[in-house]
Each structure stands twice: as structure tokens, then as C-alpha cells.
Amino acid sequence: MSLNNSSNVFLDSVPSNTNRFQVSVINENHESSAAADDNTDPPHYEETSFGDEAQKRLRISFRPGNQECYDNFLQSGETAKTDASFHAYDSHTNTYYLQTFGHNTMDAVPKIEYYRNTGSISGPKVNRPSLLEIHEQLAKNVAVTPSSADRVANGDGIPGDEQAENKEDDQAGVVKFGWVKGVLVRCMLNIWGVMLFIRLSWIVGEAGIGLGVLIILLSTMVTSITGLSTSAIATNGFVRGGGAYYLISRSLGPEFGGSIGLIFAFANAVAVAMYVVGFAETVVDLLKESDSMMVDPTNDIRIIGSITVVILLGISVAGMEWEAKAQVILLVILLIAIANFFIGTVIPSNNEKKSRGFFNYQASIFAENFGPRFTKGEGFFSVFAIFFPAATGILAGANISGDLEDPQDAIPRGTMLAIFITTVAYLGVAICVGACVVRDATGNMNDTIISGMNCNGSAACGLGYDFSRCRHEPCQYGLMNNFQVMSMVSGFGPLITAGIFSATLSSALASLVSAPKVFQALCKDNIYKALQFFAKGYGKNNEPLRGYILTFLIAMAFILIAELNTIAPIISNFFLASYALINFSCFHASYAKSPGWRPAYGIYNMWVSLFGAVLCCAVMFVINWWAAVITYVIEFFLYVYVTCKKPDVNWGSSTQALSYVSALDNALELTTVEDHVKNFRPQCIVLTGGPMTRPALLDITHAFTKNSGLCICCEVFVGPRKLCVKEMNSGMAKKQAWLIKNKIKAFYAAVAADCFRDGVRSLLQASGLGRMKPNTLVIGYKKNWRKAPLTEIENYVGIIHDAFDFEIGVVIVRISQGFDISQVLQVQEELERLEQERLALEATIKDNECEEESGGIRGLFKKAGKLNITKTTPKKDGSINTSQSMHVGEFNQKLVEASTQFKKKQEKGTIDVWWLFDDGGLTLLIPYILTLRKKWKDCKLRIYVGGKINRIEEEKIVMASLLSKFRIKFADIHIIGDINIRPNKESWKVFEEMIEPYRLHESCKDLTTAEKLKRETPWKITDAELEAVKEKSYRQVRLNELLQEHSRAANLIVLSLPVARKGSISDLLYMAWLEILTKNLPPVLLVRGNHKNVLTFYS
């Protein structure tokens, strides 16, 4: 519906007497016509104008009406349409989404296209207008190029890449099934297996009618709970192909899904062999009766099974439509066979059938068969283990979820109805056969007795037959002895044989289709990269032909074994493991309380699902304990494999949801615990900027926070807020991904601020959560401070003051080459861009077959490749490698090497700790933590403390005692008694030359000039200031001399950071202190804690 064709949107949607308001489109260039329209409106309309500019474009007229009609209009879908004549290209004059309640807005009404392609939904994806687009100011007279989202939203078509993505979905003629043919039929055929015809009567004979019904109901309980869980998961969003694998993987994640998906697909493949061999055994029995054996029973099973599986493969490869038709035909045969049995129970039995134990419905037989009579070696659980595989097959419909028209409706309805119908059939057959057939019969028609003679109390005796000798010798007939009881009871025996054929072939066909479908879905997710070959589909239905061939080969291999007694329990356990995980998935998703868990199918309970999972695990051990152990071992191995490989998928699993809930609960629980010195951990804010730009600073911090503390990489975007926020938001995910890729256990946080100091101040105050708040600020040393603008120096020193104000410790790290490698990264990005352009250009030339031009271009690149240049490329570990491609310079090469120095294992050496001032112990704790790391374990601690020359030995003993109480191992302790002596003249001269450009020298000038200079350059170092802190300046210079003397060969120096009292020491003088203190030394950590204890010797 176009607004150009109708000036009244709502009049086209609902009757005029119920319209609530009217939207009339008015030509912007013809205000006169607008005025005319205003005059023609019905007098009972209440008109509201929204400003002069809005009045020129549209008019909203409210009409009386009820809410119901209004809601009906909104639900009709018209509001989701847009007028192609109103374009989003003019950001000022045109109206956007004019039908969105008649407002001049870019806001879009809710549409399903906005929610597509979110990890589980296929179909065209449209992007709604972003928050910035509808929030930012509109620039007048600016032509905006329409985005793909705009074109789709305005009905102008789907972008090309999205069309390609959804080509498969848009293909005509794709076969999709409803809930009857797709789920109900398949589940019924898979559940009604050969057990129904040749084992159920034996189960009733062993367990009796009472326990037999209990066995059926117990099996049904397992399948029903699993069916409810399956229905809940299947209705919690759009379901793709993959069946049980898809449900489990999207609920519990790739680790569980990938492990169970592989064994579930394998189990279905082997199940094909199991059902085909069951069919072949029946055929071989018929051949025996007619004396038509080909070779021998075993080889005949192999021959018939091989031929059968080839035929089934042909039906499957022909397409799902042919396979579905075959399934319907087999179901009809099966239903006729079941009906034939029930009809046979009411047909009067002849003498031959009576001699075999069939007497029609008799109360005496029902009473006699009601209780159990287990033979030697059998019991309730052994009989249950034999029957339970007959109840499996409930996932046959879910396994082809990708071929269903509406999986969310079909899977719950078809699965639960199939369970109900098949359970009723099993119960009916069990009760009927138990009420009609005795347990033992001789089959001899001469075993009759005269009426009135003394009976042995058996039901058969009362009915004129004496089968008492079956107590002493084996008999061939009766529930306990004859597996063909249903064929005997039925009205026409060959129909039961046809039913057996139908049950086995239909189950084999369903498994032959399910296995490749599940396997293809698993391979498409690329969890096992080696199996990607089998992800390819063919034809309009995306048939997994490669998977069919693999399933055929597996089935053929097990058919050739021709003995299923060993593999059948493993198959059943594989299926049960899938059922257990489906139930656990439903419980886990409910327990995680994720807002995304909103199944449309509400008939489930999380605790019932958990009970079902436990029940499935118990049944696995009841059926076969060693098969259950094998299943768990295989699943555990695959789980560990997938976990180690860390597949790059994000399905919003309940495992992720529970991780969030656990983290939230733990964080809240932590707030109730008071801080204790024994639980202190370094929780650091690291001013790295982008994490990849200062890797060395991040590496050294990560070395003492990994697995023991919090590390937050912080970046401050300085500048206009609009630009900064845009840049910040666009890079956050990339930088956090870089941390994950490089296996750095840290968070990334960023703020936008007008100045650097304000941003850091915000981070210091607002970062963290509860008890997990930063207590240490880590920054790199500002190496270029003498060339930097004054504001940068003020900000740098200012953030140190701010940290101390917030009672946060400070760590300043200095290395000789500095930390910032952003220029190197820019060169790397430029090289990558040029390389991509070169490859694209060469590909274009090759495609166009322009040989002459191609030769010229390639020659150009070939010459360029001979230049002696250095290219930087990233290694797998995230470090930077250098190779000859472009000139970066010797300095950059050293910088690149320095950026990786803390990634490497440190050579055997020392960490020298100059613990000059007691800051609570942080200066000692950080190097101790470093020595616990693998990369630093060969470095020993040497402790240096200040003292008096005449008490060196006593103070050394005292410090050794303190360190022992702290349980900190050290290699040596040095007491420095000459810290306070003046440095030599050469060292002091270096310091004076350093600060000379920043001195005011007011004492050499008259008072007026000096005061004027102080006002104009308040940042300079005054003579009075320098004189007041002269002793402290001496100390910094002297400390550098001592560091050069004692620690020049150390791997790392950890040194107490001098504190500059606010208002007493200028920023430039403080920077000069730091410079002279750490000049020409190995890597240095200047550390100052917040003067609260972080070490204790109490237990």
C-alpha cells in the first residue's frame, strides 16, 4: 500500500467509523493544495498540528475509535511497509517510515526482518536505523547514500551479498513436510520396531501382564519426559536441521553438542545395519522353512542385508519426497499388520492354535499371566533392557528438522502424539496377548484332557489341555518359547511377516536419512575441521550425498559382521546419552534463568527434565553397564577435544547464561565479605591505550595478575565527544578479541573525555564491580617528557596524584626503548592493505587475460620486491616479527624486539627489589608473584633496603626475619648504609643540566621581574623549590649511582616510587627525579602501594 495512492492510510485498513486518526499526505511544494485539503476535512475531526515545518508535509487527524480496531490494524502488518516514493536519502526534508503512526521519523516499526540471521535464523536480514542515526542532529542539504538496509526497508530490493546468502532459502520447489508426514509418521515407524512383533509376547511371558505394563510405562516415562524437553527446546526459537545435535549444541554449547552429535550420527549409521540385519534374519527364517538357503545363515544375512541397504540408499538419494512416500506406504502396512493381530484375537481359535497355547480372551489366562515368572538368568531389569530399545526413536522427526515446514509446531505435536499412539499400541498388544495365550504349550493337539478330570490348576488345564510336561522339558510354543506368537494369533499370518518387514525397513530408512542430516549439520558448524568435506549439500533440498555414502559404508561394514548382540547395547546407550543431554539441556536452560529462554511449549518442568536426565543415565547402566561406560568415555574424550580446540562459535548457550549467573552471584556474595590482608590481590588498571599498541606494558602486568588478580586494559579517547564515542564503540569488540586471541586474561575498557586526566580519573573511580575494583594503577614511563607539551606532563603527573587521592597504588614501568609500537602497527596495516590491493589487481589482470598489461604490472611489483625494506607481521603468539619488505628503521626494529621481551622466558638472573620505603608491602609482593611464573622462575629475589652503616648486620638479621615470617624466599639481602651521602659531582651535573631549561632563576632577577615570570610561567622550577627539596634531589641522583653499581645486570629492578607532595614539588621537577632515578638501567618497576598492608605473617 503506497501513501501516494491513498491519502488516508487508516481508511484503507479499517472501517471509517472506527478510525482513531488519519494521515493525509500533503505535497510539500503546494501549500495551497494543503490548505484546500484542510478546508475539506469533515467538521467532526479534531486536528492537531506539529509545528510549521511538519504542517507543510503531513497532517494527523484524530478520529474517535476503539483500541481493538487500532490493535487489529497494527497486527495487520501494514505498518511494516514503507512507501517507495519516500526516500531516506534526504535527511532533512523527507519523511521516514511515514506509516509509523503518521510521525515524521526514521524510527521503524517492529519487523521480523530486523531479527533474522542472529545465529539461528536464516532469511534476509535488514538493519533497523541505528541509535546514532535517529539521535544525531540532521545536517541540512546533505545527500546521504542509501544503505542496503534503507533499500530493503523502502522496498527497493535485497542487497546482493544477502541475496547470495539466502539463495538456498529462496529456491522454489524445496520439499518441506508437515507435522504428520514429517514427524508423526517417522516417529511411529521408528518406535514400532521389530520388538513389537517378536519380543513383546516373550516380555509378557517373563514379566507378566502387570510388570510388563510397568516396563512399558517406565520406558514411556523416559521417552515422554524427553519428548517434553525436546518440545520445549524446539519451540525456543527457530530450529534448523540437525535434530538432536542442533538442540543440544544450541542449548549447552559446542562442547556437549559436538561430542554427542558425532556419536549420535554414528549410532544412527550403525542402527541402519541393526535394522537391516533384523530384516535379513526374518527373510533367512522364511528361506529355511522353504528350504531355499543360498549359502548358510550367516552369509545369507550378509547377502540379503547388502542388497537391502543398497536399495534403501537409492530411495534416500532419490530425495526426501520419495523417502517420505516410502515411509507412508510402510506405515500403512504396519498399521494393517497391527490391526490384523487385534482382529485375530477375537476370531475363534482352532485346535491347532489351542495346542500352541492360544484360547482367545480368557479371564483365567489373564489371571495366570498377570504375575511374573522369570526364567533362570532373567529379572525385571534384564527384561526391561531388552524392551527399552523398542521405545526409542522419538527423535526421528526432530532429526530432519531442517526439512519441516514449521519445526516449532511439528516437533512437539508429532513427537508427543507418536509417543501416545505407540504406547497405547504396546499396552494393547501386551494385555491382549497376555489374556489370550498361555506361557507354555506343546503344540501337540493330542494333549487334551477329558472334561471334569482333576487339573493341575493351570488355565490350560481348565480349558481342556494338559501342558504340564513343559515344566520338565522344553516346549516350542507359548509366550515363553515362541517368538512368532503374534503371527499365530493374527487373522492372517503373512501380514505379520509384512509388518516385521515394514517395521525393520522403515526404521532402517529413517536412520539412513537421520544420520547424514545430523552429520551434515555437525560438519557445517566446523567444530571438527577435518570433517568439513561432508558439509556440502546437493540439489534443491541440500541433500548430504557425501554423508549418505559414508553412512552406507558404515552400515555395510556392520552388516558384514552379521551379529548384533554385541553392538546393539552400545547403540541403545548412544541414543540414551542423547536423551539424557536433551533433558539436561532443558533443565540447564531453565536453571540459568536467561531472558532468552522463552519456549512456546509450556508443558515442561525443569526438575522433571533433570529427573529424566538422571533416569536416562540409570537406564544406560541397567541395559548394559560396560556399554554405558564406553559411551561416557567416548563422550568425555570428544568433549575434551572440542573444549581444547575452542571452536569459533557463539550460540548463546545456557552454559554461557549460567556462567553469567554464577559470576553475578559470586560478585554479589563477595560484597558481603570484608577485605582481609590475606586475600589481597593486585587488581590493576593498565593505561595501555589499545592493548596491541603497548604489548610489553601489558605483558609485565599480566605476569603478576594472571590467575591471581584483575587486569583492565584502559584507553582514553580525547577530543570531541561525538567523534571519540564513535571511534571508541567501533573498536571495543576488536580489542577485547585481541586479548582473547593472545590468551591474555584481561578486560578492555575505554572512556571518552575532554582531556586525558579526566578520562583516567573516571576510570579510577568507576572501573570494577563490587570488591573487584582496581587497587593499583599501572602506567608506562613517559620517556619523551622533555619534548612533550606542558599539558601532557601536567596530565601525566596529575593522574599519579589522582591515584594517591583515591588511595590506589601506582606502578610506573620503564624500559629502554619505550612501549608504544603504534607506528609499527600502522606500517603493518599499510603493508597488508597494499598486499591485498596487489593480489586483487593481479587477480583482475589474470581474469581479464590481459597478458601484456599483466606482465608490466607484475614486473613493477617484482622490482618493488627487491627493495631492502622491512615488513612487520604478527606471529601466532601476538608478537611482531620482522622480515625484509619495507624499511622501518633500526630504531623500530629495536622497539619491536623490546615489545616482546616480557613474552619470552627470562634468563637465569635476579629481580632486584629496592624496598626503600614501607608502602604496605606491594613493592615486595609484586616481584614475589613474578617469581612464581614459569617465565620468571629462574630469577631469584635480591632485597635492598636502607640502613645505618654501623648497624648493617643487625638490620640484615631483622629484615631476614621479617621476610621469613612473610614466607618469601630470597637469594640475598643487602643493607645500603650510604644512601644519604651526596652524589658525585658528575652525576649531580647531569641532573642540573636536565632541569636547567625548566628553571626560573628568580634569585638572579629583581623582585618585579621575578614575580612577573612566576605569573607567566608558573610551571617552572623556582630556586626556592629546588633549595627546599635539595636533599631529596640528592637522594634520587645517589640512588641511580647505587642502582648502577649493584643492579645493572639484573633482569628486573623493582624500586620504591618517590612521592611528590602536592603543592611542594612541581611537575617538571618530579619528572626529572624519575628520569635521573631510572636512567640507563634494565627494566624498572617504580612501585608505591596505598600504604595499607598487603602482606601479613599471621595465619
Swiss-Prot record:
Annotated tissue distribution: Kidney; localizes to the thick ascending limbs (at protein level).
InterPro entries, alphabetized: AA-permease/SLC12A_dom, AA_permease_N, SLC12_C, Slc12a1, SLC12A1/SLC12A2, SLC12A_fam
Phosphoserine found at: S61, S91, S120, S130, S148
Residue ranges annotated as motif RFXV motif: 20-23
Gene Ontology BP annotations: cell volume homeostasis; chloride ion homeostasis; chloride transmembrane transport; monoatomic ion transmembrane transport; monoatomic ion transport; potassium ion homeostasis; potassium ion import across plasma membrane; sodium ion homeostasis
Gene3D superfamilies: Amino acid/polyamine transporter I (1.20.1740.10)
Activity regulation note: Activated following phosphorylation by OXSR1/OSR1 and STK39/SPAK downstream of WNK kinases (WNK1, WNK2, WNK3 or WNK4).
Disease: Bartter syndrome 1, antenatal: A form of Bartter syndrome, an autosomal recessive disorder characterized by impaired salt reabsorption in the thick ascending loop of Henle with pronounced salt wasting, hypokalemic metabolic alkalosis, and varying degrees of hypercalciuria. BARTS1 is a life-threatening condition beginning in utero, with marked fetal polyuria that leads to polyhydramnios and premature delivery. Another hallmark is a marked hypercalciuria and, as a secondary consequence, the development of nephrocalcinosis and osteopenia.
Quaternary context: When phosphorylated, interacts with PPP3CB.
Protein's name in the database: Solute carrier family 12 member 1
Species whose genome carries this gene: Homo sapiens
